[in-house]
Amino acid sequence: MKFTNLTAKEFGAFTDSMPYSHFTQTVGHYELKLAEGYETHLVGIKNNNNEVIAACLLTAVPVMKVFKYFYSNRGPVIDYENQELVHFFFNELSKYVKKHRCLYLHIDPYLPYQYLNHDGEITGNASNDWFFDKMSNLGFEHTGFHKGFDPVLQIRYHSVLDLKDKTADDIIKNMDGLRKRNTKKVKKNGVKVRYLSEEELPIFRSFMEDTSESKAFADRDDKFYYNRLKYYKDRVLVPLAYINFDEYIKELNEERDILNKDLNKALKDIEKRPENKKAHNKRDNLQQQLDANEQKIEEGKRLQEEHGNELPISAGFFFINPFEVVYYAGGTSNAFRHFAGSYAVQWEMINYALNHGIDRYNFYGVSGKFTEDAEDTGVVKFKKGYNAEIIEYVGDFIKPINKPVYAAYTALKKVKDRIF
């Protein structure tokens, strides 16, 4: 085995072939970081047949003028079951970054620690406890099992839906009642989905602004999304849910005809048997449905006059690789939330994964707090409704490479933090 630099082609071919390969360990992310002006390294291990068996994208940032901070975002991509390989990689990586004036090395591997349900109850262990001892022996310090959303650290909890050996019908069957109803609702009510181009990205951004204002969370800036759409190319998809009013109103008219037919039948049943309570209840229920149907038709015609035949209602931002589809961000028009456009977006992308043989649909980050007063309690309930599971990752590890200078650096940082 040998530790070596990799070409982008070698790196991409390997990371695309591996499980637990995060979108930040892809050629698209490498090209993005180069364009942003970061010092970037592609490194890995090759076996005696010159085949890549481990790979890692590293970025380096200047620290204290003469040193650098090296970071591998969700790297390396490696067979973590091969502990000998893991040891060799991190040992050689430390030597490599030392040659490049590294002050300290930071990693947050895409490696599960344990599994939980959406109530926060542990359902299983990922059998990676050994990794903590291994990293400690190699000189890495674990930063702790942090929870919540941090502007610097990667989120440690993901909500993930397993699609392996499942059909679309299986997914719907396993949803809770609300998710089933809304998924069927958008399939029925003329809600369509198409993918936005780079020129149309402002539509998505407007929805994100609506959502961030209503839910009081900090969104990324425009540059973040535009750059990833540009450099990730077909590894980013931005689905837009919209109402096609011609189809929507047509379907509502067809529904009205059926309801009127059923109502007339119920009225005839009452004429024949006035004492039949079931017929009276059925009449009342059908009349309520008809009233609601009429309101929807009136609303649809009004909105069609105001907005034209197509009305954008929701959009999402997704990262794609052979391992998983990642729901990174999404927003919905507050004025048209009742059309349940976000469910159309989710259903479109779940089916995208199924149709492309991708076994994992990642709803992405949750805080890991699982309490009613947690900042993301509504989001957790939404993801829980799809019958997803929670994966908790091992977290962050830091290795001081130049120990004396790193000690001085951390001491100065603590003083600065106290002052400011």
UniProtKB/Swiss-Prot annotation:
N-terminal signal peptide: none
Record localization: Cytoplasm
UniProt keyword annotations, A-Z: Acyltransferase, Cell shape, Cell wall biogenesis/degradation, Cytoplasm, Peptidoglycan synthesis, Transferase
Gene Ontology biological process terms from the UniProt entry: cell wall organization; peptidoglycan biosynthetic process; regulation of cell shape
Enzyme class: transferase
Gene Ontology terms, MF aspect: aminoacyltransferase activity; nucleotide binding
Reaction(s) the record says it catalyses: beta-D-GlcNAc-(1->4)-Mur2Ac(oyl-L-Ala-D-isoglutaminyl-L-Lys-(N(6)-Gly)-D-Ala-D-Ala)-di-trans,octa-cis-undecaprenyl diphosphate + 2 glycyl-tRNA(Gly) = MurNAc-L-Ala-D-isoglutaminyl-L-Lys-(N(6)-tri-Gly)-D-Ala-D-Ala-diphospho-di-trans,octa-cis-undecaprenyl-GlcNAc + 2 tRNA(Gly) + 2 H(+)
Enzyme Commission number(s) of this protein: 2.3.2.17
SUPFAM superfamilies: Acyl-CoA N-acyltransferases (Nat), tRNA-binding arm
GO cellular component: cytoplasm
Similarity comment: Belongs to the FemABX family.
Assembly: Homodimer. Interacts with FemB.
Function: Catalyzes the formation of the pentaglycine interpeptide bridge, which is characteristic of the S.aureus peptidoglycan. Adds glycines 2 and 3 of the pentaglycine bridge, using glycyl-tRNA(Gly) as donor.
Name by which UniProt lists this protein: Aminoacyltransferase FemA
Species of the source: Staphylococcus aureus (strain bovine RF122 / ET3-1)
Gene: femA
